[in-house]
Amino acid sequence: MKKVEAIIRPFKLDEVKIALVNAGIVGMTVSEVRGFGRQKGQTERYRGSEYTVEFLQKLKVEIVVDDNQVDMVVDKIIAAARTGEIGDGKIFISPVEQVIRIRTGEKNTEAV
C-alpha cells in the first residue's frame, strides 16, 4: 500500500474530490496547510498598505491506496488540480506498512 499526499490550491479541492470519487476512491483526509516553494509568497494589499505573504494557503489531500491504484490516483489529481501556473502544488508518494481500522480491527486493504 502507498500513501499519496497532494498539496493543492484550495479552490481545486472540489474538482480533485469529484475526480477521485468518480474513480472509486472512497476515503481521503484533507488538511489546511501553509507553505512556499518556487512561488515564494505573494504581495497583497490591505487597507492601502502592501505586505508580503510568505506562506501561502494550500490544502493537503491524503489517500491510502493499493500499489496498483497509485498511478491512476496521481493521474486524476494532476488532471483535476493543474492550472499550468507556478504554485499548482506537489504530490508525494510513500510506503504504508500497515493500516488498522480501529472500530473493527480490520487490517490493510480491508481497513482502507
Swiss-Prot record:
It holds the Pfam family P-II. The modification Phosphoserine is found at residue 49. The keyword Mitochondrion does not apply. One of its GO terms (biological process) is regulation of nitrogen utilization. PROSITE patterns: PII_GLNB_CTER, PII_GLNB_DOM, PII_GLNB_UMP. Phosphorylation dependent on the nitrogen source and spectral light quality. The modification O-UMP-tyrosine is found at residue 51. The keyword S-adenosyl-L-methionine does not apply. GO terms for molecular function: ATP binding; enzyme regulator activity. InterPro entries: N-reg_PII (IPR002187), N-reg_PII-like_a/b (IPR011322), N-reg_PII/ATP_PRibTrfase_C (IPR015867), N-reg_PII_CS (IPR017918), N-reg_PII_urydylation_site (IPR002332). Keywords: Nucleotide-binding, Phosphoprotein, Transcription, Transcription regulation. GO terms for cellular component: cytosol. PANTHER family: NITROGEN REGULATORY PROTEIN P-II, NITROGEN REGULATORY PROTEIN P-II HOMOLOG. Belongs to the P(II) protein family. P-II indirectly controls the transcription of the GS gene (glnA). P-II prevents NR-II-catalyzed conversion of NR-I to NR-I-phosphate, the transcriptional activator of glnA. When P-II is phosphorylated, these events are reversed. In nitrogen-limiting conditions, when the ratio of Gln to 2-ketoglutarate decreases, P-II is phosphorylated which allows the deadenylation of glutamine synthetase (GS), thus activating the enzyme. Homotrimer. This is Nitrogen regulatory protein P-II. The gene is glnB.
